[in-house]
Amino acid sequence: MSVSAELVIETANVSKSYRRGFWGRNSFTALNDVSLQVPRGEIYGLLGPNGAGKTTLIKILLGIIRKSAGNATVLGHAAGSMEARRRIGYLPENHRIPRHLTALTALEYYGSLSGMSMSAIRAERMKLLEVVGLRGREKERVSGYSKGMLQRLGLAQAMLHRPDLIVLDEPTDGVDPVGRREIRDVLKQLADQGHSIFLNSHLLQEIELICSSVAILNHGKLLKTGSVRELTAALADAPVQMQLTGD
């Protein structure tokens, strides 16, 4: 198997700049020369503070926005191409499920948007609700769901068409500790089944608990890549800087 076939995501010198200000005379660089290789069959974490460029990179990989420079491939195809997009399951940050839907009708709705037949959706939905721990709650309206339950339903939506790659944007953000643990358990189960998962988070602890490899992004620049074990060992020897604010 070639190196490219063993990778689900590969970027080479990807940059993204935006024009802003009057007449677009000023520019802002959201990503600067990012080169990344994400192996198949792992939970790979993209770690960085808010505003680091994590979501920008995900949107480039999904074809939502265009890169300014560099090359990016997903599952062996150009990022954003139809061949790549149809094989990706995506859970965006702060996704919104129509509140009048139940888990069952929500999966029908999102499956139909993906072009799935109703018979194919119904063949998968109960199995997925079992996986994400919502079996028995499938006929309740999502308006009564907790944030953690909504995120787990979002995971089921992302897996509905049996994608080769699952992309998650801040999947545990705003979720209570119990809900975070439930989401981690689902993701670990998926990884044990051989799924490839690429997620971003600004929470170091979440990355440590679930990911096998990590890339650290800050101010649009890739600072470090490696295994989580290597990262935590490096952080253990790093100096601690504290900043106090107040009156």
Which sequence ranges carry the predicted segments?
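Conserved ABC ATPase "signature" region
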Residues: 108, 112, 119-137
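Conserved ABC transporter NBD signature motif
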Residues: 70-84
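Walker A (P-loop) phosphate-binding loop of ABC-type ATPase nucleotide-binding domains
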Residues: 49-53
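ABC transporter nucleotide-binding domain
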Residues: 183-247
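Catalytic Walker B motif of ABC-type/P-loop ATPase nucleotide-binding domains
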Residues: 166-170
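Conserved catalytic motifs of ABC-family nucleotide-binding domains
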Residues: 162
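A short, flexible loop at the N-terminus of ABC-type nucleotide-binding domains that lies
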Residues: 2-9, 17-33
